[in-house]
Amino acid sequence: MITEKPLKFGIQNGLNVARAGYTEDQILTACMLADKTGYDSIFYMDHTNVPQWKNAIVLDPWVMLSAIAAVTNNVELGTCVTDAIRRHPSNIALATITLDRISKGRAILGIGAGEAQNLKEFCIPFEKPVSKWEEQIQVIKTLYGSTPDHTVNYDGKYYKLEGACLQAPPIRKPHPPTYMAAGGTRTLELTGKLGDGWLPIGYTPELFEDHAKQIQVSMDTHNRTQKEKDNFQYALVIDVYFSEDAEESWANMK
């Protein structure tokens, strides 16, 4: 059973913002307003490009989130989502910690297994993404607790660490939460095994409930503690269109 929690609201700087061609200053202004008016979180997409919309402006999420952190005080800040292919897990771990420190403990790592877009045209192999995703999250969490006096090792199929460490401890304890983007049987199972939250997009209530139950079964299977289960966050990204005319809003939604 999902532990009842207060309902929170955030904003997503996703394809909608990129397609609109908003400038950096406009995005920062909107984020400052969201922070002042009581929104709980701000997320930022991670794409290299969206060539189907030629006039879109596509920016780096980690740089933008750091800029947003500097002009906000309360909102949590996360990627929605970065992927497990384009960056080495050490880079993702350090970027997340850096954002957490700049924001004084407000960082969230939203991460998925990736997609062919943004990979193939840059000749980045799109192979075994879910297996790499699992190892990435394990490596990232291992590195969160590393120091020069406590180096870490990892011997995976795709990633290896030998006496590795980072030198910037996160503010959040034990580390920034990991929200996993999942919708398939295996990815839902891994979310229950490794995640601190779940970040699906565009679900119906029925599908959300079904997939949430699969995550809960995985939590039980992998002996997650009751505290981990209670603290697990169930999120959902949905599109919202504002208009004085309901039919116009529905047309935009479609």
Residue ranges and their predicted role:
Residues M1-K254:
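Active-site-adjacent structural elements that line small-molecule/cofactor binding pockets in enzymes
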